[in-house]
């Protein structure tokens, strides 16, 4: 018995010796912080000393929501003491920052180890190898600046969101043996006919070595958690990357109603020793355009959604916690969002939410606004760097369908168009598997039938993205919106056509939520009457904070009243209207149908969005919030435009509230069939 236990212990120790030695250690607590309103920190070399007059803060953090610092746009200093074990000397030690807005200098024990200039929203990494005192306490100092400078993107004050400075996202240390895997890129290719998927895996390592890779691929975010592949392979080295490929059978594709994911764990083996381990999620989907029409996994679809502007809650600003990010994602899904865009790069958690909950995203670099100068080499260089890092950081997210290179720039200026063209080409070079696009507000400046017609920069992308504000920012009769949209389509007939923004901005255009309702309804009616409109994005999910003047609020409360929720996530009446207009299924009637039965009349949406409703459930209840306590009726598949009649039990004397729920648990539509007898 002793020998049996002894050999079992030896096997266990051998097993643990082979487990990959990667630790991720959060470093978000007990940072010392001080603002530098006198701009003396650099000249007095604060980075060489322990900061004085500080307060303790936790990450993520921004000073612009603090009462005394709301209007400070300049330098802020952070410092943290970290004890580094002596046995880390031969390991790889990397400090990861989720984002620091907008420029930062990183010091270890008084010496500069990194800088990140003009890029306030991308995740970045600081290699600390050989720059630490091992077995001792080390001091990490971060000096960051959020002034309205010109050595950044967005340029100067050319942006419409808050200017919150600080270490606005979380930070962590990544510790592993060597060689170290710096990144993993998984490119899936779905073969619908064969129900199989090929994956190409590229691993970026800090050095080329004779290594083996142990691969495990598991179902993720699916009803089952099967291991679909477990294999050890020797990679091929191409351009400094370790490359491997596999073919998987019986694939469950990613779809916004069925966001099936796969998890890949790659262990780097050096001989018999596991030196590092890197993991990511990915998904198989085929998204393509055919003759201007959109297809997802072979299904003809149209898209509808809403955009959320991060930093909108004045209690958090850009320093949003995980719970706030997830809560905002849920609000998006509560209005049937399956399609969105972001004006600037978001926290990894946001894209993970979109992966798991089914939202297709256009992620953009924050190259924004008319004041961005054409032909500016500095701006273009920073934009290119941001684009590179954005693609590298978020390559594996199946929710990301497009890389966006700018919004509302001078879309007819030849120098600006040339820069946009180069950015789109770079996006396609970095990631040939996705679309690239530019969002325009100048498509209506002139059309194909104008003798002096010059194509807009939006034509350079894979599809047209048009910001449309007829009846508000556009000083035209609402009836003329039809003509404007038709003219744009006729000017670029070979391009799929999407509405990238529409909505009502207060206080510029007053009228409250009642006017917002009217604006939403008539714009949706216009888009849904156009067979060539492939999708639309409502702007915005919430009222959002901005540095722009023009509102009665001041400091951190300055805002655009633009949302179907307020800044804190409280719904307005327009929220339910957006949800109903964005539903893929319509409930049109509840009729008596024999003794004890009611008949529900349903149609698949022929507007926005359009897709097959598969796996949806129907409930009838007497209140809006208690439907899950009632019987669930499994609905048949409903195609766009298809009429479906469905019988349910009559529990409330011919009345009731019909709720239809998507496979992932979100309400698609909810309609009351209660009425007052005096109204009959």
Regions found by a protein language model. Give the residues of each.
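Intrinsically disordered, low-complexity Pro/Gly/Ser/Thr-rich segments with frequent PxxP/GP/PP motifs
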Residues: 229-249, 627-652
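Extended acidic/polar, glycine-enriched regions
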Residues: 133-137, 202-288
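Accessory beta-strand-rich segments of carbohydrate-active enzymes
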Residues: 29, 33-37, 69, 73-181, ...
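Beta-strand-rich binding/interaction modules
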Residues: 106-108, 195-233, 597-633, 656-661
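Bacterial Sec-dependent N-terminal signal peptides
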Residues: 1-22
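Extended substrate-binding grooves/exosites of carbohydrate-active enzymes
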Residues: 55-60, 66, 111, 117, ...
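Short, aromatic- and glycine-rich surface loops/edge beta-strands on solvent-exposed regions
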Residues: 139-142, 258-270, 653-666
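Accessory carbohydrate-binding/adhesion or oligomerization-edge regions at the termini
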Residues: 20-66, 139, 143, 147, ...
């Amino acid at each position: 018995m002793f020998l049996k236990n002894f050999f079992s212990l030896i096997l266990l120790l051998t097993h643990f010796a082979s487990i990959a030695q990667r630790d991720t250690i959060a470093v978000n607590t007990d940072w010392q912080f001080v603002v530098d309103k006198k701009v003396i920190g650099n000249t007095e070399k604060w980075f060489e000393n322990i900061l004085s007059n500080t307060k303790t803060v936790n990450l993520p953090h921004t000073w612009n929501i603090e009462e005394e610092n709301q209007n400070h746009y300049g330098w802020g200093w952070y410092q943290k003491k970290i004890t580094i074990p002596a046995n880390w000397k031969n390991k790889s030690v990397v400090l990861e920052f989720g984002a620091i807005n907008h420029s930062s200098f990183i010091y270890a024990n008084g010496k500069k180890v990194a800088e990140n200039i003009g890029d306030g929203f991308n995740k970045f990494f600081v290699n600390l190898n050989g720059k630490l005192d091992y077995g001792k306490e080390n001091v990490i100092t971060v000096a960051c600046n959020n002034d309205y400078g010109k050595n950044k993107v967005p340029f100067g004050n050319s942006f419409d969101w808050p200017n919150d400075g600080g270490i606005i996202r979380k930070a962590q240390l990544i510790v592993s043996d060597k060689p170290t895997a710096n990144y993993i890129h998984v490119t899936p290719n779905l073969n619908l006919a064969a129900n199989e998927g090929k994956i190409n895996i590229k691993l970026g390592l800090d050095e080329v070595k004779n290594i083996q890779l142990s691969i495990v691929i598991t179902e993720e975010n699916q009803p089952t958690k099967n291991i679909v592949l477990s294999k050890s392979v020797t990679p091929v080295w191409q351009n400094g990357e370790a490359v491997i490929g596999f073919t998987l059978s019986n694939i469950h594709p990613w779809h916004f109603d069925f966001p099936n994911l796969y998890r890949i764990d790659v262990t780097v083996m050096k001989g018999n020793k596991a030196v590092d381990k890197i993991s990511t999620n990915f998904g198989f989907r085929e998204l393509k355009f055919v003759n201007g029409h959109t297809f997802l996994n072979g299904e003809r679809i149209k898209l509808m959604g809403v955009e959320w502007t991060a930093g909108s809650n004045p209690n958090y600003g850009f320093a949003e916690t995980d719970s706030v990010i997830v809560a905002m994602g849920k609000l998006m899904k509560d209005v049937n969002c399956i399609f969105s865009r972001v004006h600037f790069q978001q926290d990894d958690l946001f894209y993970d939410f979109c992966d798991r909950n089914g939202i297709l995203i256009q992620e953009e670099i924050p190259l924004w606004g008319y004041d961005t100068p054409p032909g500016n080499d500095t701006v273009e260089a920073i934009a290119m760097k941001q684009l590179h890092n954005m693609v590298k950081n978020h390559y594996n997210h199946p929710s990301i369908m497009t890389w966006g290179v700018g919004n509302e720039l001078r879309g007819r200026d030849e120098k600006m168009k040339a820069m946009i063209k180069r950015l789109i080409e770079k996006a396609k070079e970095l990631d040939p598997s996705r679309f690239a696009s530019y969002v325009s507000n100048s498509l209506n400046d002139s059309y194909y039938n104008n003798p002096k017609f010059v194509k807009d920069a939006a034509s350079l992308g894979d599809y047209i993205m048009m910001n449309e504000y007829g009846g508000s920012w556009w000083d035209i009769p609402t009836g003329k919106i039809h003509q404007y949209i038709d003219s744009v389509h006729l000017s670029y007939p070979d391009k799929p056509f999407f509405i990238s923004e529409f909505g009502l901005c207060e206080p510029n255009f007053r009228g409250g939520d009642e006017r917002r309702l009217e604006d939403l309804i008539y714009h949706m009616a216009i888009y849904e009457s156009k067979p060539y409109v492939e999708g639309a994005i409502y702007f915005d999910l919430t009222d959002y904070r901005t540095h722009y003047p023009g509102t009665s609020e001041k400091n951190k409360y300055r805002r655009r009243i633009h949302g179907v929720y307020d800044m804190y996530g409280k719904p307005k009446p327009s929220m339910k209207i957006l949800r109903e207009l964005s539903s893929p299924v319509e409930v049109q009637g509840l009729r008596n149908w024999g003794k004890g039965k009611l008949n529900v009349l349903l149609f698949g949406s022929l507007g926005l969005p359009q897709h097959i409703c598969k796996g949806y459930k129907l409930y009838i209840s007497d209140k809006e919030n208690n439907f899950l306590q009632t019987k669930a009726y499994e609905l048949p598949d409903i195609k766009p435009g298809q009429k479906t009649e469905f019988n349910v039990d009559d529990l409330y004397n011919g009345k009731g509230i019909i709720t239809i729920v998507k496979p992932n648990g979100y309400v698609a539509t909810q309609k009351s069939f209660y009425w007052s007898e005096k109204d009959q």
